[in-house]
């Protein structure tokens, strides 16, 4: 696998006009915490505490996808020869923003440092959780499907 230097990474080979970066956190819950307690903390404690700060720093969208045992079991109905490996993450959290500097500034905010850094240790296994970032490609036309 080739390694990109910083200038290559910051200058993709396509236009990023009107595109969002998406930080995806593939999260594991803290050892010993139940699925229900993990989801409850993220939805009812962390989200309300985080939302206004994200808006302040230009975050355009934030989603949480909780992969509890009951929904993970549904995957057995979708497996086929090409798609048969089940991800064991407890949650995917996705944060959409236009500029990585905005997100970096949010992490430097004193309120973030005082409240949110500690909160992650309450519910997340921060040593096992993983992250990635990429440009979002949207395919419209699904608005009237439901």
Swiss-Prot record:
Enzyme class: lyase
Keyword Cytoplasm set for record: no
Superkingdom of origin: Eukaryota
Matches recorded under Pfam families: EthD
Record GO terms (molecular function): lyase activity; oxidoreductase activity
Lyase found in the keyword field: yes
Domain EthD: residue ranges: 31-126
InterPro entries, alphabetized: Dimeric_a/b-barrel, EthD_dom
Assigned protein family: Belongs to the tpcK family.
Role: Decarboxylase; part of the gene cluster that mediates the biosynthesis of the dimeric xanthones cryptosporioptides. The pathway begins with the synthesis of atrochrysone thioester by the polyketide synthase dmx-nrPKS. The atrochrysone carboxyl ACP thioesterase dmxR1 then breaks the thioester bond and releases the atrochrysone carboxylic acid from dmx-nrPKS. Atrochrysone carboxylic acid is decarboxylated by the decarboxylase dmxR15, and oxidized by the anthrone oxygenase dmxR16 to yield emodin. Emodin is then reduced to emodin hydroquinone by the oxidoreductase dmxR7.
Protein's name in the database: Decarboxylase dmxR15
Name of the gene: dmxR15
